[in-house]
Amino acid sequence: MTAEQLLEKTYAAFNARDVDRALSAMHPEVAWPNGMEGGCVHGHRGIREYWTRQWGLIDPRVEPRGFEWEPDGRVAVDVHQVVRDLAGRVVKDEMVRHVYRLEAGLIRSMEIRSGPSRGAGAPGPTRTGP
């Protein structure tokens, strides 16, 4: 499985609220940003607890729009993120950049950066490799 396929699988699992499927793509000691409260959560248990808490408050959906390899080997993903409140009202609609470090074919860490490098107007998915 390519890095892009692994990440697409993970985004699809997150959007389906299938925590077990998403965690199957992650290293047991994964480091994950807590985008709601700040800081970072660690490991499968930390992510499960964080996402469960998050989904009880908001309804986020993330769609990868393009992949790019960074010089240090990490994979950057331009993501369209739409966050709704539990009544369905859009509270956030933006492009963000997620940057992943992979280890042994699994996600080892992720960081969130504001805005994609190519801008939100980039046409369709873009994939570039190392």
What are these regions, as identified by a protein language model?
Residues 1-2, 48-130:
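A beta-strand edge to alpha-helix "cap/lid" segment located at domain peripheries
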Residues 16-31:
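Short, well-ordered alpha-helical segments enriched in acidic and aromatic residues
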Residues 31-41, 53-57, 113:
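A short gly/proline-enriched turn/hairpin at secondary-structure junctions
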